[in-house]
Amino acid sequence: MATLPITCPGSPTGCNSHTGEGGKKPIELNHTIIPAKDKWASAQFLADILNLEAGPEWGHFVPVKTDNGVTLDFSDSTDFGPRHFAFLVSEAEFDAALARIRAAGVKHYANFRRERPGEINHLYGGRGVYFDDPNGHLLELITRPYGPTPEGG
């Protein structure tokens, strides 16, 4: 595998200030754009479920920032297909979000095939739930990261 040189134009110290353990810069997801029929309504829907803040509007986007610093930038669009977004949450956050989903009358499912309506799953010793946002994007909340083999489906 080829290694590309990392350069930081204008930096007197090169990229050392951007490197992590072993001199390698940690790779992190910073943001993603989520197409929406109504960017404000979609951003607010997610923010309400996850108990986060939507906005303020930034250019073409309405951002929702997660606790680990990833920004979901909602943008008005008319031409898009459904996407999937999974959020790792604590047990307490899961309980609160599931209560908000149910209180809002949002249909939820135990798996991505939208089977077992009204149920949750217990994969990998945790809990998970799937539900659609107003644009048809499939959202997922999990309390444990998934591994190579599902357990407790």
Where are these regions (language model features)?
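Short secondary-structure boundary/hinge segments and terminal tails
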Residues: P63-K65, R83, G118-I120
